[in-house]
Amino acid sequence: MDCSFSADIQTRIDNKTKPLGALGVLEKVALQLALIQSQDQAQAVEEIVIRKPTMLVFAGDHGVAKEGISIAPSEVTQQMVANFLAGGAAINCFCDVNQIEFKVIDCGMLAPIEVMVPEFKSHPNLIEQRLGNGTANFSKQAAMSSEQVALGLEYGARVAQSTIYSGSNLLMFGEMGIGNTSSASALLAALSPLEVNHCVGLGTGINSEQLSRKLKLVAQGVSRCRGLDAKAVLSQVGGFEIVQMVGAFLEAKRLKTPVLVDGFIVSVAAYVATLLDEETRDYMLFAHRSEENGHKFVLESLKAEPLLDLGLRLGEGTGAALALPLLKAAAQFYNKMASFESAGVTV
């Protein structure tokens, strides 16, 4: 990222009618958004514009879920996607109240949505980019082929590009997939210095017996990943929705568009994206700190300051949707708050 206007933007923020740094993290948000929107400009932007913020929820199923390490069976992925399309989920409520465009991407559920609800096949909020009928069980074999990884990265880039070209200048990523905390935990354990037990958590609320089994299965998958690069690790233990999010992060960076990152699983996808292209980090804002093991490390590793800490562990993009008003507030103070000079305030 070209940071040549960073000092000008910071001076503009510092000259607002407030003590230096008094708006805390919001000042950092304003600086980042203004810097992103100043790319390819002749000067620092005078106004931050948030246009058509869009939530992309990436959905996929996981073969490892057959091992009974989630509170729900794999069919719930498809059932929840149907709930999203019917407008009945938490993410729909939060998108509605905050005027967020909403799309759900079928990256590879066990079956297409029309098998369950035929009339949803042509739903305007559904994007089908299926890589298969769920991944293989990564505790026993590679979750997907290298060809599926490459195609998934391409699909993710495609949906990010089409969303941006349709007028959105702020993307928000969420996810849905029974078993995907196991995949995210395995990716983190394989690609970071952390031990498996520091990466695996309770997900959406498993019991101690399931947690013990989950630790064992994740360790089995991670044992095949020694010495592998990020794309190869995605093949071994990744998820269809996770690999597409990685591709979407990479494309958002290429098109100089910020992404508001949801919780643990989306943050792990963000972490993987930075391993493939470290400059993707410049375009990421982090919505919240989740209850999941490993999320703290990801946030610290990416030098991220999450905007919220509400004890959330739902996924779906709910934390990102709840954090959007803070981005709007950061833009508003940057755009409208008086300077000491214009307000006639002496300090």
From Swiss-Prot:
It is an enzyme of class 2 (transferase). The active site is at residue 316. Its EC number is 2.4.2.21. GO terms for biological process: cobalamin biosynthetic process. Pfam families: DBI_PRT (PF02277). One of its GO terms (molecular function) is nicotinate-nucleotide-dimethylbenzimidazole phosphoribosyltransferase activity. It catalyses: 5,6-dimethylbenzimidazole + nicotinate beta-D-ribonucleotide = alpha-ribazole 5'-phosphate + nicotinate + H(+). Pathway: Nucleoside biosynthesis; alpha-ribazole biosynthesis; alpha-ribazole from 5,6-dimethylbenzimidazole: step 1/2. The keyword Glycosyltransferase applies. Keywords: Cobalamin biosynthesis, Glycosyltransferase, Transferase. Disulfide bonds: none annotated. NCBIfam families: cobT_DBIPRT, PRK00105.1. Catalyzes the synthesis of alpha-ribazole-5'-phosphate from nicotinate mononucleotide (NAMN) and 5,6-dimethylbenzimidazole (DMB). Belongs to the CobT family. This is Nicotinate-nucleotide--dimethylbenzimidazole phosphoribosyltransferase. It comes from Vibrio parahaemolyticus serotype O3:K6 (strain RIMD 2210633). The lineage of its organism: Bacteria, Pseudomonadati, Pseudomonadota, Gammaproteobacteria, Vibrionales.
